[in-house]
Amino acid sequence: NNDETAHLKEVVLEFTKTTYQSGPIELVWVTDVPIPFWNPKAGNDNYFNNYIYQSWTYKGNTIGTPFITSPAINEKDSNIVTNNRVLAFYFAGLYEYNHLQCELKYSYSINKGTYSVPIGEKGQHSMMFKVGRDIPSLKDLHVQLCVGWDKGAFLGNSFALGVCAKKKF
């Protein structure tokens, strides 16, 4: 069959590390002279948290990376980011075979909380797999099946299944 084609269309690999914020050198001011001291917790920039302005959050959501946990999902009614020390790996791929589009997104993160409130090292797997196809006999109709899965000590375990039909006009 001449219509059978297979090819990888897109690949994304990402690595995020915010576990070591600003390094171990702390400047201590003695009169007018800054003296550097070694302190393993000196960085403590506390990414995404600032008590004067909103920092990298907007209406309770973090901006820039999904791995820094949004204040919107805090168990307690708190407007701060409670997990900004993260080591994360992300992979995404889009593959097409014989008019069937397959998409996979997978991430693994190690979540450490903040310097002031550490939570140990809580691992979290997250995966989404989507397969879709245009239906030639029904012009401009596209159907998809999607599966999502989370497993880990940080956000817990969950599973979701979705079915979608799209019609273009």
Provide a role label for each language-model segment.
Residues 1-169:
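Outer-membrane beta-barrel pore domains
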